[in-house]
Every structure is written in C-alpha cells, then in structure tokens.
C-alpha cells in the first residue's frame, strides 16, 4: 500500500515538473507540439531585430518582424490525441510595413502582419507560404475548420484560405461576401 502511494506521488511530481518546464529567458512563449518543444523569440529583444521560432532548440523559421506568436483567438491550432499542438497558425508583425496601394478615401494602405501555418503532423515540420487577408489589411483570424486532408481559414473581412499539402491558397477574397460571416 505504501509502495503504491509512493509510486503515485512520484508520478504526480514528475508530471507536474514536466508541465511547468520553464521557457528559456529569451523566449516570449513556449508550446508543446507533436514533434517537440516550440519556442517563440520576438525580434524586438534581438540585436538583429529578427523574430525566430525554434523547435527542440533548432531554428525552423525567421522573419523580419518585431513580434511573433500563436494566433490568440483560440481557433488557430488543433491538438493531436495526446493534446499536443498538431497544426498551428502563427502571426508576425513586420518591422517595416508593406505598402499595398493608395485608396482615394483613406490614403496609403499598408500591411502590418502576415500569417503562416505550421504543420507538425508528419515526421518533420511543414511551414506554409505566407498569407494575409486582402480586403481589410488588419483583419484578424475569425475561425478555422481543421480537417485531415485540408483546412479552411477565415478572417474577419470574409476572406477565406485553404491549406492543403503544405500550401495555403486564397479561395475567397472577402469582397463579395454577403453572408453572416462578414460582420
């Protein structure tokens, strides 16, 4: 009986200590994925002003941005059976905004952020191409329909994207959206 209690206590202690493993000091956030530990390092804290993402301590992504992280609305990821992140949408905010066009009413329009989808479901991480909503240049992620073969990503401006085989393509630019999705 005492031996069972000791084993249960040791299992509890090891589980709790693993769950509260600290992020490195220069990382802004850490997450556990199907392939291991993910660390976000924002460019504003780096001498070269480049944001980075590390997987198990190895750099897998770098961008000219001052901030990087998981999309915060709660739909930007899907978990595997062990409750680790399997697919994830990452946003990053550019160091230098990107000129898009001049609008007669609003003047010059700029893009401040972009997105990529990270897929940890295979033996190696797959990082999608860069994508962003075109109709409203500061639209946030609204919802994601995660699937085994493909996923649909929708933004607040009504634009929709499809992720399949490591690539994201726009399937609706949001300009003709009259449904309840555009609010």
Features from the language model and the residues they span:
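A short beta-strand motif characteristic of beta-propeller blades
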Residues: 61-67, 127-130
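Acidic, small-residue rich beta-repeat scaffolds with periodic aromatic anchors
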Residues: 5, 18-50, 57, 120-183
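N-terminal signal peptide c-region/cleavage motif recognized by signal peptidases
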Residues: 14-16
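Repetitive beta-architecture junctions, highlighting loop-to-beta-strand starts
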Residues: 48-51, 113-115
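Short beta-strand elements that form the blades of beta-propeller/WD-repeat-like
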Residues: 34-44, 85-109, 148-156
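Sec-dependent signal peptide recognition
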Residues: 2-12
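Beta-propeller blade signature
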Residues: 106-122
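Signature of short aromatic-glycine-proline-rich micro-motifs recurring in repeat-based ectodomains
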Residues: 70-79, 156-158
């Amino acid at each position: 009986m005492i031996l069972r209690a000791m084993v249960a206590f040791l299992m509890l202690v090891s589980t709790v200590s693993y769950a509260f493993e600290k992020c490195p000091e220069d990382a802004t956030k850490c997450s556990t994925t199907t392939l291991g530990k993910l660390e976000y390092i924002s460019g504003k804290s780096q001498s070269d002003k480049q944001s980075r993402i590390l997987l198990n301590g190895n750099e897998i992504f770098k961008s000219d941005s001052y901030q990087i992280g998981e999309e915060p609305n709660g739909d930007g990821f899907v978990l595997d059976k062990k409750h680790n992140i399997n697919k994830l949408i990452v946003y990053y905010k550019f160091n230098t905004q990107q000129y898009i066009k001049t609008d007669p009413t609003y003047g010059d329009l700029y893009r401040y952020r972009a997105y990529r989808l990270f897929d940890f479901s295979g033996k190696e991480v797959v990082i999608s191409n860069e994508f962003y909503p075109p109709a409203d240049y500061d639209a946030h992620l609204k919802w994601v329909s995660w699937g085994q073969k493909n996923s649909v990503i929708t933004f607040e401006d009504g634009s929709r994207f499809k992720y399949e085989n490591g690539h994201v393509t726009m399937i609706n630019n949001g300009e003709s959206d009259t449904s309840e999705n555009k609010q």
